[in-house]
Amino acid sequence: MSLQNDIITALGVKSSIEPAQEIRVSVDFLKNYLNAHPFVTSLVLGISGGQDSTLTGKLCQTAITELRNETGNARYQFIAVRLPYGVQADEADCQDAIAFIQPDRVLTVNIKPAIEASEATLRAIGVELSDFVKGNEKARERMKAQYSIAGMNAGLVVGTDHAAEAVTGFFTKYGDGGTDINPIFRLNKRQGKALLRELGCPSHLYTKAPTADLEEDRPSLPDEVALGVTYEKIDDYLEGKQIEAKDAAIIENWYRKTEHKRRPPITVFDDFWR
């Protein structure tokens, strides 16, 4: 079996999907997990205004609404969390995403004061953060806030990790990669777009260039520039299509380099790294 086939199998990607069916799969997955854990009554998710959090947020709210209606338990809630670093450049998109999702609750946590305090504390002991490392600090601070909110609301922190992100390891370890449950894990980028179209999402929320926007030296850096390969090529690869050798090599290099991100902490029993 080729590495491409191994990756497709590991990430559970289908070569084609039926959007309505996949929406149902994700919603039922969330509902079934909460039904199996009755002490959990909330789903918590950071909303950035991009494709992945918009899709995941809509799936979460749908699942929670159905659970409330089916069980009569009014404690079930979806909490959308806005987590800007100061003022977000695409704040209008965030508000459009919130309007589309219609979450039960919306909380806003400005992470900038916490990041600046951490940066100053480290600087005082001689540790000066690079812009890249500071970007990862932002991702981890966002997750810290979400876990605090979840902890006070009997909740789970929901992740937006999908196959095109997982294959490249394009997430911060113990940042946006540190979640409890990932309902869109098996989908690639174009499949996520198809689900949003099916759900009636405003198109500008999933047609704009994806960006993590963590680095201040390179603001709004497109994911595809950072990765060196387009999502179109990544999606083709994940659907089993043949792509140019140079693009496949980039994807497979990212996959090998970031294997540690897709695993729990390494122990003496692990041998994938040998």
Swiss-Prot record:
Residues annotated for deamido-NAD(+) binding in this entry: R140, K173, D180, H260, K261
InterPro entries membership: NAD/GMP_synthase (IPR022310), NAD_synthase (IPR003694), NH(3)-dep_NAD(+)_synth (IPR022926), Rossmann-like_a/b/a_fold (IPR014729)
Known EC number: 6.3.1.5
Binding-site residues for ATP, renumbered to this chain: G46, I47, S48, G49, G50, Q51, D52, S53, T160, K189, T211
One Gene Ontology term of the molecular function aspect: NAD+ synthase (glutamine-hydrolyzing) activity
Reactions performed catalytically: deamido-NAD(+) + NH4(+) + ATP = AMP + diphosphate + NAD(+) + H(+)
Top-tier EC class: ligase
Keywords: ATP-binding, Ligase, Magnesium, Metal-binding, NAD, Nucleotide-binding
GO terms under biological process: NAD biosynthetic process
Pathway membership, UniProt: Cofactor biosynthesis; NAD(+) biosynthesis; NAD(+) from deamido-NAD(+) (ammonia route): step 1/1
Sites where the protein binds Mg(2+): D52, E165
SUPFAM superfamilies reported for this sequence: Adenine nucleotide alpha hydrolases-like
Family to which this protein belongs: Belongs to the NAD synthetase family.
Described purpose of this protein according to its UniProt entry: Catalyzes the ATP-dependent amidation of deamido-NAD to form NAD. Uses ammonia as a nitrogen source.
Name the UniProt record assigns to this protein: NH(3)-dependent NAD(+) synthetase
Source species taxonomy: Bacteria, Pseudomonadati, Pseudomonadota, Gammaproteobacteria, Enterobacterales
Gene behind this protein: nadE
